[in-house]
């Protein structure tokens, strides 16, 4: 079904091609004093608690149960639905010894990241560009964390391997190992604003000198022990965008982020916020407004 209040929209032509950041810091309020920061390329502005960005999605990839091909994502973008079922990701491009360390969530994230990169492995002496990767997940490997807490409650010894695989940057680290990738990466979480925060992080890296940045967003439903804390629809999914700054006259996407002193969230959505962001990137919708946790995020695109 289409998102509430939105018409069905056509899917952009070409798998792994999209539309939509460049960073400009204009003015910044710090401790009641105004500081003027260096001007960059006029595609990101920061003022007090407000942030505006413009960006291009150079390529994309996505993976979810029942939505594994470009054709299925085309159908999904035209009339979104909440993916159901358990992920079945073979991850054939990853060596068996490393592949067995990936839990289902990690397999989804790895598949999206590898699809975005074209399954290309980087040799140790490869001439790498400086393009970093941002991994963004609201919950990450919460199931592994809960298992460790259960072991501790029983008085069992904690497995160093299990602990290492439970930390928030573990999935990104294993993907880097699978690809032989020694470039910069980071892992973030920001509640329902995780996808938007991932774009902000990627754009900051572009402003720091990278020519492009990859954003990998992934999540799964909370385990049963934490299910009572779910506050939005949940599903297994992962998607990846390759982001760059827009060129002069190029059609771009925009993200406006601001703090709002309100506890009133938007109506209960049909999709989790991170899947809403993917839908907006793949569709021709002109605007998507997300409001939660004291933040208001407005996604828009050039006509």
Where are these regions (language model features)?
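Active-site-proximal alpha-helical scaffold in enzymes
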Residues: 110-114, 119, 189-213
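Conserved "HGTGT" condensation-loop signature of ketosynthase/thiolase-family condensing enzymes
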Residues: 1-140, 144-162, 167-185, 217-303
């Amino acid at each position: 079904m289409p998102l509430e209040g939105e018409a069905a929209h056509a899917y952009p032509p070409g798998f792994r091609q999209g539309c939509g950041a460049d960073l400009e810091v204009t003015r910044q309020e710090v401790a009641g004093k105004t500081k003027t920061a260096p001007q960059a390329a006029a595609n990101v502005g920061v003022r007090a608690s407000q942030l505006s960005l413009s960006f291009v999605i150079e390529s994309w990839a996505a993976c979810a149960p029942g939505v594994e091909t470009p054709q299925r994502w085309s159908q999904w973008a035209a009339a979104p639905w909440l993916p159901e079922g358990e992920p079945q990701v073979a991850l054939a491009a990853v060596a068996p010894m490393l592949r067995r360390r990936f839990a289902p969530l990690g397999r989804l994230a790895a598949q999206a990241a590898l699809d975005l990169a074209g399954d290309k492995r980087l040799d140790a002496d490869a001439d790498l560009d400086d393009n970093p990767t941002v991994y963004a997940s609201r919950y990450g490997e919460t199931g592994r964390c809960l298992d460790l807490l259960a072991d501790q409650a029983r008085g069992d010894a904690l497995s160093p391997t299990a602990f290492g695989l439970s930390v928030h940057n573990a999935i990104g680290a294993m993907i880097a190992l699978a690809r032989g990738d020694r470039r910069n990466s980071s892992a973030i979480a920001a509640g329902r604003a995780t996808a938007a925060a991932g774009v902000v992080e990627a754009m900051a890296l572009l402003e720091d000198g990278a020519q492009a940045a990859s954003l990998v967003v992934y999540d799964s439903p909370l385990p049963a022990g934490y299910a009572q804390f779910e506050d939005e629809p949940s599903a297994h999914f992962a998607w990846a965008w390759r982001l760059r700054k827009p060129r002069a006259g190029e059609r771009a996407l925009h993200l406006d982020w601001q703090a709002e002193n309100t506890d009133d969230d938007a109506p209960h959505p049909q999709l989790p916020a991170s899947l809403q962001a993917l839908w907006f990137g793949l569709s021709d919708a002109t605007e998507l407004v997300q409001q939660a946790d004291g933040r208001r995020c407005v996604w828009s695109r050039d006509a």
